[in-house]
Curated annotation (Swiss-Prot):
InterPro entries: DUF4764, ZN839, Znf_C2H2_type
Molecular-function GO term, any one: zinc ion binding
Region (Disordered): 329-349, 455-555, 612-654
Superkingdom per UniProt: Eukaryota
Biased composition, class Basic and acidic residues, residue ranges: 476-485
Cross-referenced Pfam families: DUF4764 (PF15961)
Entry protein name: Zinc finger protein 839
Protein encoded by which gene: ZNF839
Zn finger (C2H2-type) start-end: 197-222
Ranges of compositional bias, category Polar residues: 501-510
Keywords: Metal-binding, Zinc, Zinc-finger
């Protein structure tokens, strides 16, 4: 049974009344009054009534809860007024006051005790839970209770097993389930925190100011929080979360904003009472009821808090927080009222949090995250001022700013030089210059001046190797021609008689389809000119063009030069062999074998009539063979008419000598006229192992307007013959031959002699259209009578024409 304790105000002695604030048993009042709460019996619930003579009745009820946590309704009982209004003292009720005790218990404690008694009896009436031998509660879920057959209502350890399959042992009380279900949702049985923050517009209530502030934010028309209420709520929240000293100090800070005179100000803020320290140490909860004052303009509302035990936070931290709250309150009191002051007050915590985050952040992360945002709102000058102001607070700004500006100017000048040197004239962006002095200090003016004086030296240099070759060739062509003419007067060396290397033969492999692929050609021996790349374009019916790329990067067309296409047919085991011919400049060319038993095509060039030489002696002929006007036959695949075998049944790979610079003068040549040609191949006796080889060749040429020098500006002799005979101007490489005009019927090599037969039908190369046979011996090239085929019988050469007529020719 509860024993209430009445609290009566009494006048305190002057020795007991402190000058400032007082604190007894954790209860502090910011007034000259002193309240003391003492329970009658510590083991029973206690009720305390607070009253003041000059105020409306105030009451605080403190109760020790039972195991079933629930809210105890409190009854407000007006306290009698005492004649002395100076102070009040709470004294415990003695045993000599039965009337007060009876009245209080009958009015406030009796309904609560009767309610507890009925609940306890109903709980005892419930059946005991069924437990197994291990102590586990054996019961199915409630939603399966009606369908489960074997639900035991007694302990399995004491009872016996049932063999029945019915629901006889299952007993479910519907009314009991309904009562339990109703009790689960009974608000009176739940310990809910009171919602003291209500919206005056929509009647919604919230536990704390945060919910009410969120409600005002979502519904702006309902109103907004009072700044004073926000500050008082912050202060009260910090005090109730701390220890006893923290609560005392924060209550004092709240009292600073209230009127000092208790009689003039009307109602004060409610006093928070708590039970004795023994109850707090046991972890008992304390429910505090707050009363509203009669005059709202002079009071402050504090929400109730549940205190569930002392916090483990250090008192020093809580004291610091409480001091911060006091400073914020004083600052808010000094600020003029209005929404602007409230906005500044709300922004201060966010600034504090941001400052704390910046202190914890690393420098690298700070630069990465904050610098892009800062660069958008801060100018360079403002950043310079801030940087200088941080380090030089007491010094003048300009020397420090000038020092920083010099560093900045140095870096910008370096970047400017890099920009001008890299971009130059190819820059797509325009550089706008507003101050000439700044441009001059950065070096831009000097750069523009140099560009006007030497425009070629500033731009990027991208000279191709082809352009270099053409420029060198054009610049020194005349000089090289004069040097070549002078070298032609030197002694003439005989051609080196060497066999072709295996690598060269392999590199000159033929394509059976008659198409030429571009591939590098290498020199056959020492003293040759650099290797060239020969690319033969696809053959057309009208023209044939060959591109020759020199070793030094120069490119020139070889189509105007002599292009000989040779193909040998092997009659003893081999189908075809790839032959090689070299021009007078020492450049190897291709001679690809065509299809088996087919003729190949060759291209020859003729000199203009006015530049041709006529020699009647063998020595003149041999000298003319070493003249620099010879052109190299370039190989090309192609097929022609097949030639019937004109020799013995065995044959092997031979070599086709070069035929160059045929005489085109549209006149009938005399028997003594000689066309300067030369066999560029190695000696025939080393290549041919049989007496005669029949070779079929066809000549095909491309028009060329004028002379074409080699990659070094002059044409060199073949092999290691460095000296040239003749004049370049007298033996140009120009030629004009059309495809399909001329064919070699047969070429027969006998020892060191070789005979060429040119069929009739050419009125451009040979004006009269007769057949001509050129026989090459060790002494030179001899023009044979027309229309013959050469054969060998010991020392006598028999020349026979295509119709079978023969004429004797002694070697």
């Amino acid at each position: 049974m509860l024993l209430p304790t009445t609290i009566q105000p009494q006048t305190a002695r002057k020795s007991q009344l402190p000058r400032g604030n007082s604190c007894l048993v954790g209860l502090h009042i910011a007034s000259p009054q002193l309240l003391r709460v003492q329970p009658l019996v510590r083991t029973e619930p206690q009720s305390c009534f607070l009253s003041d003579l000059c105020q409306p009745p105030a009451q605080g009820f403190v109760q020790r809860p039972l195991p079933a946590l629930q809210v105890v309704p409190a009854k407000r009982v007006p306290a009698p007024k005492a004649p002395d209004e100076q102070g009040s003292m709470l004294t415990p009720l003695s045993a000599s006051d039965p009337l007060a005790v009876t009245s209080l218990s009958s009015s406030s404690a009796h309904p609560f005790i009767s309610n507890l008694h009925t609940r306890h009896t109903e709980k005892l009436k419930k059946s005991l839970k069924v437990k197994t031998r291990s102590g586990r509660v054996s019961r199915p879920p409630k939603y399966k209770a009606k369908d489960y057959k074997f639900i035991k209502t007694e302990d399995l350890a004491d009872g016996h097993l049932s063999d029945s399959d019915d629901y006889s042992e299952l007993c479910v009380e519907e009314d009991e389930d309904q009562r339990e279900r109703h009790a689960l949702f009974d608000l009176s049985s739940c310990s809910l925190r009171p919602k003291s923050f209500k919206c005056q517009t929509c009647e919604k209530s919230y536990i704390g100011k945060g919910g009410l502030a969120r409600h005002f934010k979502l519904n702006p028309g309902h109103g907004q929080l009072d700044p004073e209420m926000v500050l008082s709520e912050k202060a009260s929240g910090s005090t109730l979360r701390g220890c006893t000293e923290e609560r005392t100090l924060s209550l004092t800070s709240l009292g600073l904003s209230m009127p000092a005179d208790p009689c003039e100000g009307g109602a004060r803020s409610c006093l928070v009472t708590e039970s004795a320290r023994g109850g707090l140490q046991n972890g008992q909860s304390v429910d505090v009821e707050e009363t509203l004052p009669s005059e709202p303009e002079n009071g402050a509302l504090l929400r109730s808090e549940r205190y569930q035990g002392p916090r483990r936070r250090a008192c020093s931290e809580t004291l610091a927080e409480s001091r911060t709250a006091v400073l914020q309150q004083r600052r808010a009191a000094q600020l003029p009222g209005g929404p602007a002051a409230a906005g500044e007050q709300r922004a201060s915590p966010s600034k504090a949090r941001l400052k704390e985050f910046l202190q914890q952040c690393d420098r690298e992360d700070l630069v990465e995250l904050a610098l892009p945002q800062l660069a958008q709102v801060v100018t360079v000058y403002e950043f310079l001022l801030m940087k200088v102001e941080k380090d030089h607070l007491a010094k003048p700004f300009f020397p420090a700013i000038y020092k920083e500006f010099e560093e900045l100017h140095k870096m910008v000048k370096k970047m400017c030089q890099d920009y001008l040197s890299s971009s130059g004239l190819c820059s797509q962006e325009t550089l706008e210059i507003n101050n000439d002095k700044v441009a001059e200090s950065l070096g831009i003016t000097e750069f523009l001046r140099k560009k006007e004086i030497h425009p070629d030296n500033l731009g990027p240099k991208h000279l191709s190797r082809d352009m270099d070759g053409e420029q060198l060739e054009g610049a020194s062509s005349e000089k090289r021609e004069r040097e070549a003419a002078e070298e032609g007067l030197a002694s003439v060396k005989r051609p080196r008689r060497e066999a072709l290397s295996n690598d060269t033969t392999e590199s000159l492999a033929a394509n059976s389809r008659g198409r030429e692929k571009p591939r590098p050609l290498h020199a056959l021996a020492a003293g040759f000119s650099p290797p060239v790349n020969v690319t033969v374009s696809p053959r057309s019916e009208e023209s044939h063009t060959t591109t020759v790329s020199g070793g030094n990067g120069s490119v020139f067309q070889a189509g105007p030069q002599l292009q000989a296409l040779a193909n040998l047919e092997a009659r003893r085991g081999s189908i075809g062999a790839a032959l090689s011919s070299r021009d007078v400049s020492g450049l190897p060319v291709y001679a690809q074998s065509g299809e088996p038993r087919r003729l190949t095509q060759a291209q020859v060039a003729a000199f203009p009539g006015e530049n041709a030489l006529e020699h009647s002696s063998d020595q003149d002929t041999w000298d003319s063979l070493r003249s620099p006007g010879f052109c190299s036959p370039l190989s090309s695949g192609g097929g022609a008419e097949s030639l019937p075998p004109g020799g013995p049944g065995h044959a092997e790979a031979g070599h086709l000598g070069k035929v160059c610079d045929f005489h085109l003068n549209h006149q009938q040549p005399s028997p003594t006229s000689v066309l300067p040609t030369e066999v560029a191949a190695p000696p025939l006796e080393k290549i041919l192992s049989v007496d005669s080889v029949a070779v079929d060749c066809a000549y095909r040429t491309v028009p060329k307007p004028g002379p074409q020098p080699g990659p070094h500006g002059s044409l060199l002799t073949e092999g290691c013959l460095r000296s040239l005979s003749g004049d370049l101007n007298r033996f140009p490489c120009g030629m004009e031959v059309h495809s399909g005009q001329r064919e070699l019927e047969s070429v027969v090599a006998v020892g060191e002699a070789m005979a060429f037969e040119i069929s009739n039908g050419s009125h451009e190369l040979l004006s009269q259209g007769q057949k001509q046979i050129f026989i090459q011996t060790s002494d030179g090239l001899i023009l044979s009578p027309p229309g013959t085929i050469v054969s060998q019988e010991e020392d006598i050469v028999t020349v026979t024409d295509a119709e079978g007529r023969a004429c004797g020719w002694a070697r």
